[in-house]
Design a protein with these regions (language model features):
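N-terminal strand-loop element at the rim of the active site
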Residues: 7-11, 23-68
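Short acidic alpha-helix that forms the nucleotide-activated donor recognition element
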Residues: 264-273
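Nucleotide-sugar donor phosphate/pyrophosphate-binding loop at the beta->alpha transition
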Residues: 108-117, 123-141, 157
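Aromatic "clamp/platform" in nucleotide-sugar-dependent glycosyltransferases that forms part
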Residues: 262, 281
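A conserved nucleotide-sugar
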Residues: 196-203, 214-259
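A short helix/loop element that forms part of the nucleotide-sugar donor recognition site in Leloir-type
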Residues: 181-196
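Carbohydrate-associated surface elements
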Residues: 154, 175
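An amphipathic, basic-hydrophobic alpha-helix
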Residues: 61-88, 97-102, 132-136, 140, ...
Length: 290
């Protein structure tokens, strides 16, 4: 099959899962086309079955915000026609499901009928999508999808509770590639680079958004380090990072906390760790913990 995958190209769980899914499908002989605004961070190498198409949004002074959704819809139409795509798989409802629906309608006017699968990942439903400004469009685009999946039963339940959804939602949990991890088992873990043997290493990995309760992680570590010699490794980028750095300074623990930024070498970081913290307010799946 020829499959177009629409996702965010960032380090967030939805983008990571979408990219890994595409790579696994490519290994099985399917032709995969990623369509997004930049190359996905987990798409290190392209192969004959994997293609990446960037969506370019022309700058125009009239627009206060550039119309990415329109550009994405048009790009989908072009790619479906050019590569004879069999199915669209859009990850994260906003704005991908709506853009996918618009593309379907434009293609239908030309006699091209293509099914669309929408995968719901979490905050596209429970936070952003539930906002009154977006809710009608999100509900509409989900109901217009040919197949809808969610990454957990709890997210499926939340979707039915928060939206007027008529479609059946299939639960397909997120995954990690175990064979890849087995290949990395022989990679040496240089823990001594992070902390001496008598110190414990606490780790947190996320997109540093409010729902992840970043300040609580710092405060939890503040109490831990009083009782146990330890260091905290904070991996990721996001709006709450600067506040967390300031809190570390206020508590006088800045020399015990390491902020890594985004990383593609999570396996190496986790091999250092004695404890992983994920005290999120809510998680639809929690891929980092898996």
């Amino acid at each position: 099959m020829k499959i177009a995958i629409v996702c965010y190209p960032t380090f967030g769980g939805s983008g990571v899962v979408a990219t890994e899914l595409g790579l696994e499908l490519a290994k099985r002989g399917h032709e995969i086309h990623f369509i997004t605004y930049s190359q996905p961070v987990r798409l290190a190498l392209l192969n004959p079955n994997v293609h990446n198409h960037e969506v370019h949004v022309p700058e125009y002074p009239l627009f206060h915000y550039q119309p990415y959704e329109l550009a994405l819809s048009s790009k989908l139409v072009d790619m479906v026609k050019l590569y004879k795509i069999d199915v669209l798989h859009v990850h994260y409802a906003i704005p991908h499901a709506y853009a996918g629906y618009m593309a379907k309608q434009m293609l239908a006017d030309e006699g091209i009928h293509i099914p669309m699968v929408t995968t719901l990942h979490g905050t596209d439903i429970t936070l952003v999508g539930n906002h009154p400004f977006y809710k009608p469009a999100v509900s509409f685009s989900i109901n217009k999808s040919d197949v809808v999946t969610s990454v957990s039963q709890s997210l499926k339940d939340d979707t039915y509770r928060l939206f007027d959804i008529k479609n059946e939602i299939d639960v397909i949990p997120n995954f990690i590639e175990l064979n890849k991890d087995k290949l990395k088992e022989n990679i040496p873990c240089h823990r001594s680079l992070m902390a001496p043997d008598n110190e414990k290493i606490i780790t947190h990995i996320s997109n540093f958004r409010k729902v992840k309760r970043i300040d609580d992680i710092v405060r939890i570590f503040f109490e831990i380090q009083k009782e146990v010699p330890s260091k905290l490794m904070m991996v990721g980028e996001g709006p709450e990072k600067e506040g967390a750095e300031q809190l570390c300074e206020q508590l006088g623990i800045q020399n015990k906390v390491i902020f890594f930024g985004n990383s593609n070498e999570i396996d190496k970081i986790l091999c250092f760790s004695d404890l992983f913290l994920l005290p999120s307010e809510t998680e639809s799946f929690g891929l980092a913990a898996l």
